[in-house]
Amino acid sequence: MKIILIDNYDSFTFNLYHYLSSYCKVEVVRNDKIDSSEILKKKYNKIVISPGPGNPNQAGNCLKIVKKLYKKIPILGVCLGHQIIGQVFGSKIIQAKTLVHGKTSKIFSKKIGILKNLPKTFDATRYHSLIIDKKTLSKNLSITAETKNGVIMGIQHKNYNVHGVQFHPESIKTKYGLKILKNFIIEK
């Protein structure tokens, strides 16, 4: 198994790398140093899109990569990566009513997809000012997790192996973060 971890110039990327590399080979590449044809050529089995500053339009080649490869290679987006997936499928990314940087929140899971074997509620660390607008959520995406206030914390594509989490599974304060990443790795 070989994963490409697309780095959106974020300090959390290597926490993700550390967790993922305990299960498989991981190559970290910056978001503007790779494109979909190179990903196909290198025969990666899965794609993980890291957190990062800014919004999806500022994430190098990530939007194009998801658009071109979501039917071919499983994808997991974390924080900014989650927002990229939402935007690719037509959801709007908006400013959150409350900015959440370095705070832990209760996450309410629907226990499906990469969250299937977790408790219905768990604590997770959040660092974000943008969110997927629930009112414009794509019909192609399902909500897999939310906060108590209904902020989308997890999504998955209805027909393809594409997942996003707004929270940070790589944070030490996210109780089941390693399990979530493992679920993505082992999911067919």
Regions found by a protein language model. Name each.
Residues 26-31:
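Short hydrophobic/Thr-rich beta-strand motif most characteristic of the beta2 strand and flanking loop
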